[in-house]
């Protein structure tokens, strides 16, 4: 009779059963690995960007860009980062900061600029992909969801301008937005397992996402036979 209350009390105190504690530790370990993976994928994206190539777009598929909507915001962030780097260096020199400190701060700021460039490159080189096998929905290096053709019942146009967050799960709906917008919806026949950016798993039956040219994306879905489509708005 006391086992259940004791277990609840243990959870409140940060404990729990040994199995639960091991599971929690494993989840904590997933986050650093995924963060390192994001950085590695971003650096690969920089290399692809320089070579004007894209990641994961076979000849039989159609790339569906989404970088256009967020390009100005990301470039502005990059410019601010560069200005901050220069301003901090000038300030540290003016107050006579020792060279090792200046070099350390400069290195950290330069790495921040590199990461900002990597995110921009990942957004450009990792578009959504629509092909005969299905639909691949991505958000830079942070999310990569493959939707098999057999699960897709409908792709339709929508106009949502008030989405919250770039990547979010609301019930059984996955939302992948750009500057708070989505304009395409994919409906599924059954729940699809989705791994969120920091490793948490969700099961979704609807996906809302953004494309720079949603009409072209819908046409690609129709011509590739990737889905049963409808152009109705939602």
Predicted regions and their residues:
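Hydrophobic alpha-helical transmembrane segments of multipass integral membrane proteins
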Residues: 78-88, 106-117
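Cytosol-/stroma-facing membrane-proximal "stalk/adaptor" domains immediately downstream
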Residues: 200-234
């Amino acid at each position: 009779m006391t086992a259940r209350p004791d277990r609840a009390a243990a959870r409140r105190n940060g404990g729990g059963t040994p199995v639960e504690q091991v599971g929690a530790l494993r989840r904590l370990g997933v986050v650093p690995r995924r963060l390192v993976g994001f950085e590695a994928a971003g650096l690969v994206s920089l290399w692809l960007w320089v070579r004007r190539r894209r990641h994961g777009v076979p000849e039989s598929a159609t790339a569906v860009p989404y970088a256009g909507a967020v390009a100005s915001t990301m470039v502005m962030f990059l410019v601010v980062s560069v200005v901050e780097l220069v301003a901090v260096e000038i300030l540290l020199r003016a107050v006579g900061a020792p060279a090792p400190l200046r070099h350390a701060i400069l290195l950290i700021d330069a790495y921040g600029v590199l990461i900002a460039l990597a995110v921009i490159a990942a957004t450009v080189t990792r578009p959504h992909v629509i092909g005969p096998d299905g639909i691949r929905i991505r958000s830079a290096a942070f999310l990569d969801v493959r939707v098999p053709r057999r699960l897709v019942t409908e792709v339709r146009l929508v106009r949502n301008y008030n989405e919250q967050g770039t990547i979010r799960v609301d019930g059984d709906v996955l939302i992948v937005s750009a500057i708070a917008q989505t304009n395409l919806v994919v409906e599924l026949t059954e729940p699809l397992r989705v791994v969120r950016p920091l490793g948490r798993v969700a099961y979704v039956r609807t996906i809302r996402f953004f494309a720079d040219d949603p009409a072209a994306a819908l046409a690609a879905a129709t011509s590739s036979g990737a889905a049963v489509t409808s152009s109705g708005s939602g």
